[in-house]
C-alpha cells in the first residue's frame, strides 16, 4: 500500500483493509440505497458497519443513489450532508402498457399463453427494427422457460458463433441450454452465472450480436447496456411484488450509454403505485429491526437511549475479548453466543472441530458444517451432509467434473423418487444448481460461517488450534492460487487462472502479463486475461 491510494471495494473488502488505513480523504458510496433494511439485501449489515467505521475517519463524503425523494434528517445532520435530488435524465423515456385482448381483463394464469404470444410478437417487431431489448422477468427459471419458448416460436433461427462456446464445451457441457440461446441471438442475464459469462453476454449484446436478453433482478445491479427497449414482463421479484423503487430502477436501464436518445418501456401488468421513497439509515435510526452485529459495532456515544438495554442484553456475561471477536465477525451476536455456549458445554464437539488441513475429509467437513447448520443456524435438518459433499467435490475437481457428478447424483435421486425428466432437463438443472452453489454457498456463505466457527473454537480451545483458512481460500477462490486470485474480481474464469502454473511469489501479475503466450489458454480465456491485465 502506497501513501496515496484509490480503492474500489465492496463493503466486505472495506472492513478487511480498513485497520491498515489511517486516513480517508474522500469516500464515495454508489447505490447507497442498499444501506436500507427495507431493501432486504443480505449484505446490509456489512454496508452499514463499513460506512460507520469509515466515517469515524471524517472523510469528505459523496453518496449516490437513484430514485430517492428524501433521506433521514437525523442522518443528514449527523454527517453534515446536503441532499440534492434531480429528475434530470440524458434519455427521454416512453412507456406503453401491453393489454390482453379482453381490455379490462388483467393478465393471469388463464391468459398466460396469450401474454407470452404478445411478448414474442413484440420482440419480433423490435428485432426486425434492430433495436436491442432486455426483458425483465421475476426469476431465473422463468427467464429460461421464456427463452426456450421464444426460440420455438421463431420461423428462422440464426446460427451465431461466439468465442465463449469453446469455453462452455470444455468447462460446462456442450448440451448447456445457454449455448443454444446464444446461438439464436438470445442471452440470459442471471446473477448465478460466473462473472465472465455475464460480461461476455453483455459485450455481445452491446456489439449488436445478441438481439434480446432475458434478465432477472441482477439487471438492476448497476448493469449498463445499449438496450433501447426494456420489457417488464412480470411485476414480481421472485414471489414478492416489485416496489415502485424497483420499477423505476428497471425502467432506468432503457436508452443508456449515449447510443439512443429515447428509451422505450413496455409493461404488461399494472405498475406499483407511486410513493415517496425515503431512505432509512439503520445505523442512525436504530429501530427494533436493527441487526445485533450492527449495534455492537457502534460506539457507546452513538447508541440511542432506547437501544441501550438491547445492547446490554447482548453483551452481558460476555468477556471483553470474546465480544471483540464477535464484533469482528460481523455476524448475528445472538447466534454467535448460542454457538459459544454450546461448544463451551460440549468439549467433545469442540475437540472434533480442531482441524487445520487444506483438504478435510467428508466426515470432518460434514461434522463441522453440521455444527454450523444445527447450532449456529438453528436448523434441525441434515442439509449439511449435502453441502459437505458438494464442497468436497468443488474443492477436488474441475467445474466440468463437478457438474458430471451432479448429473449422476440427480439421475439416481430422480429414479428413486420415480420422477420423469429428460436428459436435457437433468443436465441443465444440474448446471444451474452447481453454478448457484458455487456463487452463493461455496464462495460466500460457507466461508463466512466457517470463519465465525473457527474464531470461537480457538477462543475456547486451550490445547490444539483450528485453522480453516486454507480450505476457505480454496472455496472462495475456486482453487485459484491466492497470488493471482484478484483476477477473479475482474471476471477472469477460474479455469484460465488454474492453468497459470509455477508463478513467482513476487510480481505474479506482471510475470503472467509478460509470459502469457507460454500458458495453454483457449483464445476466449486469453482475451479476457489480456483485458484484465
Residue ranges with predicted function:
Residues 23-28, 211-236, 248, 263-268:
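A short beta-strand element within the Helicase C-terminal
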Residues 11-60:
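SF2 helicase catalytic motif II
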Residues 274-323:
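Long, hydrophobic alpha-helical segments
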Residues 52, 58-150, 182, 187:
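Conserved interdomain linker/interface between the two RecA-like ATPase lobes of SF2 helicase motors
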Residues 55-60, 229, 236-284:
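Conserved segment of the helicase C-terminal RecA-like domain
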Residues 1-6, 17-18, 120-212, 227, ...:
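Conserved C-terminal RecA-like helicase domain
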Residues 7-10, 28, 59-66, 212-215:
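Structural recognition of the conserved hydrophobic beta-strand(s) that form the central parallel beta-sheet
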Residues 306-533:
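C-terminal accessory/interaction regions of large nucleic acid-associated machines
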Amino acid at each position: 500500500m502506497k501513501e496515496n491510494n484509490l480503492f474500489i471495494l465492496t463493503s466486505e473488502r472495506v472492513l478487511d483493509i480498513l485497520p491498515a488505513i489511517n486516513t480517508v480523504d474522500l469516500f464515495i458510496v454508489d447505490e447507497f440505497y442498499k444501506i436500507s433494511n427495507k431493501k432486504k439485501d443480505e449484505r446490509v449489515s456489512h454496508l452499514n458497519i463499513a460506512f460507520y467505521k469509515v466515517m469515524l475517519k471524517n472523510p469528505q463524503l459523496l453518496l449516490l443513489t437513484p430514485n430517492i425523494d428524501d433521506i433521514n434528517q437525523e442522518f443528514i445532520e449527523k454527517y453534515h450532508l446536503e441532499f440534492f435530488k434531480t429528475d434530470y435524465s440524458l434519455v427521454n423515456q416512453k412507456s406503453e402498457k401491453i393489454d390482453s385482448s379482453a381490455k379490462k381483463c388483467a393478465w393471469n394464469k388463464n391468459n398466460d399463453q396469450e401474454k407470452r404470444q404478445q411478448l414474442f410478437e413484440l420482440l419480433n417487431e423490435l428485432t426486425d427494427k434492430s433495436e436491442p431489448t432486455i426483458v425483465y422477468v421475476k426469476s431465473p427459471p422463468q427467464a429460461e422457460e421464456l427463452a426456450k419458448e421464444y426460440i420455438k416460436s421463431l420461423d428462422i433461427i440464426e446460427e451465431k458463433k461466439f468465442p465463449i462456446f469453446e469455453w462452455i464445451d470444455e468447462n460446462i457441457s456442450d448440451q448447456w441450454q445457454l449455448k443454444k440461446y446464444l446461438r439464436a441471438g438470445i442471452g440470459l442475464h442471471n446473477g448465478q452465472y460466473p462473472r465472465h459469462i455475464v460480461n461476455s453476454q453483455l459485450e455481445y449484446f452491446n456489439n449488436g450480436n445478441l438481439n434480446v436478453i432475458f434478465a432477472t433482478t441482477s439487471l438492476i445491479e448497476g448493469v449498463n447496456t445499449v438496450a433501447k427497449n426494456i420489457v417488464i414482463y412480470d411485476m414480481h421479484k421472485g414471489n414478492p411484488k416489485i416496489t415502485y423503487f424497483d420499477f423505476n430502477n428497471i425502467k432506468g436501464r432503457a436508452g443508456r450509454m449515449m447510443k439512443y436518445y429515447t428509451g422505450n418501456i413496455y409493461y404488461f401488468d399494472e405498475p406499483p403505485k407511486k410513493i415517496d421513497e425515503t431512505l432509512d439509515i439503520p445505523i442512525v435510526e436504530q429501530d427494533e429491526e436493527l441487526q445485533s452485529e450492527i449495534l455492537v459495532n457502534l460506539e457507546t456515544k452513538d447508541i440511542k437511549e432506547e437501544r441501550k438495554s438491547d445492547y446490554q442484553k447482548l453483551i452481558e456475561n460476555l468477556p471483553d475479548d470474546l465480544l471483540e471477536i464477535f464484533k469482528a465477525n460481523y455476524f448475528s451476536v445472538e447466534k454467535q453466543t448460542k454457538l459459544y455456549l454450546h461448544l463451551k458445554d460440549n468439549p467433545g464437539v469442540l475437540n472434533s472441530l480442531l482441524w487445520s488441513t487444506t483438504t478435510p475429509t467428508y466426515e470432518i467437513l460434514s461434522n463441522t458444517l453440521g455444527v454450523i447448520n444445527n447450532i449456529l443456524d438453528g436448523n434441525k435438518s441434515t442439509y449439511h451432509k449435502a453441502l459437505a459433499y458438494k464442497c468436497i467435490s468443488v474443492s477436488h475437481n474441475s467445474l466440468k467434473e463437478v457438474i458430471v457428478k451432479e448429473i449422476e447424483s440427480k439421475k439416481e435421486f430422480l429414479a428413486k423418487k420415480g420422477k420423469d425428466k429428460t436428459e436435457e432437463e437433468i443436465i441443465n438443472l444440474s448446471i444451474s444448481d452447481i453454478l448457484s452453489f458455487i456463487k452463493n454457498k461455496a464462495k460466500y456463505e460457507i466461508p463466512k460461517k466457517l470463519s465465525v466457527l473457527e474464531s470461537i473454537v480457538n477462543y475456547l480451545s486451550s490445547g490444539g488450534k483450528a485453522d480453516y483458512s486454507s480450505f476457505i481460500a480454496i472455496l472462495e477462490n475456486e482453487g485459484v492460487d491466492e497470488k493471482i486470485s484478484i483476477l477473479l474480481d475482474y471476471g477472469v474464469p477460474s479455469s484460465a487462472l488454474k492453468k497459470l502454473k509455477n508463478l513467482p511469489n513476487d510480481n505474479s501479475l506482471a510475470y503472467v502479463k509478460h509470459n502469457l503466450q507460454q500458458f495453454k489458454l483457449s483464445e476466449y480465456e486469453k482475451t479476457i486475461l489480456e483485458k484484465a491485465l
